[in-house]
Amino acid sequence: ALLGPGERGEIVVRGSLVTPGYYRDRQATAEASRFGWHHTGDIGYLDDDGYLFIVDRAKDMVITGGFNVYSTEVEQALMQHPGVRDCAVVGLPDEKWGERVVAVVQAQPGTDLREAEVIAFVKTLIGSVKTPKQVHLWPDLPRSKVGKVLKTDIKATLGAAR
């Protein structure tokens, strides 16, 4: 169903310029192509003028206590802290809440960054539900060959450390 302005949902597209499928990957094609529409895996919304805004990847969204928390929103709040050089936000399993928001932060050189300080800072910007419950300080974030942060590696590392 088409959502109203400002309502967030998965972006789906169709047309002559949309891929007919993933190269040699029938399963991914079947998952993305449903009812003649290509499901992008992106969450977004249309504004009142019909402009499309991408909010996050659906797979990066954290569902905690019934609330949808977009990792990009939390990352943008973290990046406002002067001691944060880079960051990534993931969801980890939580018995009570389903998932909990967890951040991995790379500090600015020469900064003595503390977990409690970062959590308190973010809480003032986006509220307690979206604020990371844990902040891990890492010297570097894992990246792909093209420089993209590998959130799957972060989740695997943090999940294995439990």
Where are these regions (language model features)?
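FAD-site-proximal beta/loop scaffold in flavoenzymes
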Residues: G36
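Flexible coil/turn and secondary-structure edge motifs
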Residues: G159-R162
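Active-site loops of AMP-binding adenylate-forming
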Residues: D25-A28
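AMP-binding/adenylate-forming catalytic core of the ANL superfamily
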Residues: G4, E10, G15, P20-G21, ...
